[in-house]
A protein has these predicted regions:
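Loop-to-helix junctions at membrane interfaces in multi-pass transport proteins
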Residues: 2-17, 53-56, 77-94, 128, ...
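Transmembrane-helix boundary/entry motifs in multi-pass membrane transporters
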Residues: 49-67, 114-147, 276-279, 283-291, ...
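Conserved small/polar residues in nucleotide/adenosyl-binding loops
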Residues: 392-395
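Hydrophobic, small-residue-rich membrane helices and short re-entrant helix-turn-helix hairpins
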Residues: 119-124, 128, 189-200, 264-294, ...
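Hydrophobic alpha-helical segments and their helix-loop junctions in multi-pass secondary transporters
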Residues: 34, 38-42, 108, 148, ...
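Membrane-interface "cap" regions at the ends of multi-pass membrane proteins
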Residues: 4-76, 186-189, 202, 208-211, ...
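Extracellular loop-to-transmembrane helix junctions
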Residues: 15-39, 52, 81-125, 205, ...
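Helix-loop-helix module between adjacent transmembrane segments
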Residues: 91-186, 254-261, 343-351
Length: 395
């Protein structure tokens, strides 16, 4: 999941530059502090750098799995989709995402066990350990890297869109600045830094989304009044059903796809390898569906309720509905904070993809005789250039 391209850019929302600077500056400073903290107990080996010494307990594993999987789409894209489609988008996203916990639990324990057995840190390494086939390892690593690179390149583009909304400048400046920040703390502390910043980013995004929902619902006269107003109009009553949107076949096929595909995302697979124990994976899987509902409920409700205030938005405008609604009821500071919530969501995805893809290149595709630290750093820096460079081809 990722933010839409520039065709759906967030329009500048009237936030003063001074407010935006304070909000974004404070957030960036917090990320740097957490990276420095992680650096203090970082070992020199790949297991410490890529897997945090296989030390992730249940609560932190839950937080980092959720923060990694929920990108800027959770904040902006899902609210825009619910504006266009309605509440039927909620079970697709919340239940479908939560249902992945089944495969995370069943596969996750096996993944962790085989990872420890073979000293593997990536899926291709595990295949090599099981089969002894270097060709299979190279093939799988190549496929995973090629599949992840487009998604990795989109995150800086999404960051550029957010920065443009905050400051009104060109998108590429935001893309470069966010890329530099993410690379800085990822290089500094490896997975430990990424996990700790995930915790902060996840808390920021979730807290601000629920605060925004409470204010929007209160402004609409309560949830019952808002739903009654939507259902009483011929133009909006379809937003409360699924007719014409999600048939049983579409719904089931989507659930099956996510169930099997998502645990193979390199960044999620990496975290399963980094779990402290099977019990940690079990606790994570038990609570993951709850977190999925908590993450998707606010933006989807806000997007649907947005029809009451803005009934005729086009696709680009609908992707802007969440910060617009929250700014209407909370002013520029809260609107700016919600944009930072989206920034936090995309950064928690970007840093994880960067680190996981870097591990695939370093551990599976490159010569393992290369100097460890230098190889890791050069790979991550090279991968990070994909987002900014994509502007030259896609804008």
């Amino acid at each position: 999941m990722g933010m839409h391209s520039q065709d759906n850019a967030i329009a500048p929302l009237g936030i003063s530059v001074s407010s935006a600077l304070v909000i974004v500056g404070g957030y960036a400073l917090a990320m740097v502090i957490f990276a420095i903290w992680a650096r203090r107990d970082l070992g020199r080996g790949d297991e410490s750098y890529y897997l945090a010494g296989r030390s992730l307990t249940g609560p932190i594993l839950l937080v980092t799995m959720a923060a990694t999987n929920f990108s800027a789409f959770t904040v902006y894209g899902s609210s825009g989709a619910s504006y266009r489609i309605g509440l039927s988008f909620l079970p697709i996203m919340a239940f479908g995402t939560g249902f992945m916990a089944v495969s995370m639990y069943i596969l996750g324990r096996k993944i962790r066990s085989r990872s420890v057995q073979h000293g593997a840190m990536t899926a291709p390494e595990m295949v090599m350990g099981q089969t002894g086939s270097r060709s299979a390892q190279l093939t799988m690593a190549s496929v995973l890297v090629l599949a992840t690179i487009p998604y990795l390149a989109l995150q800086p583009r999404a960051a550029g869109i957010v920065f443009s909304a905050l400051f009104g400048g060109p998108d590429w400046i935001g893309a470069v600045l966010v890329t530099l920040l993410v690379v800085a703390y990822t290089l500094t502390g490896g997975l430990k830094a990424v996990v700790r910043t995930d915790a902060v980013q996840g808390a920021i995004a979730l807290g601000l989304l629920w605060l925004g929902l409470a204010m929007v619902v209160n402004d609409a006269g309560g949830i019952s009044a808002a739903m009654d107003a939507i259902s009483s109009s011929e133009n909006t009553e379809g937003l409360l059903g699924r007719e014409g949107n999600y048939t049983l076949l579409i719904w089931v096929s989507t659930m099956i796809l996510w169930l099997f595909a998502d645990p193979m995302f390199p960044q999620l697979y990496q975290r399963l390898c980094a779990a402290e124990s099977d019990a940690a994976i079990g606790r994570m899987a038990t609570l993951y569906p709850t977190v999925a509902w908590l993450a998707f409920l606010p933006p989807i409700l806000i997007g649907t309720i947005g029809h009451l205030s803005y009934p005729d938005l086009d696709r680009a405008g609908s992707d802007n509905i969440l910060p617009t609604m929250i700014m209407d009821v909370g002013g520029e500071w809260l609107g700016g904070l919600v944009l930072v919530a989206g920034l936090a969501a995309l950064m928690s995805t970007m840093d994880s993809q960067l680190l996981a893809t870097g591990s695939l290149v370093t551990r599976d595709l490159l010569d393992k005789e290369s100097p460890g630290d230098r190889s890791r750093e050069s790979v991550i820096i090279s991968l990070s250039l994909l987002g900014p460079v994509s502007y030259t081809h896609l804008t």
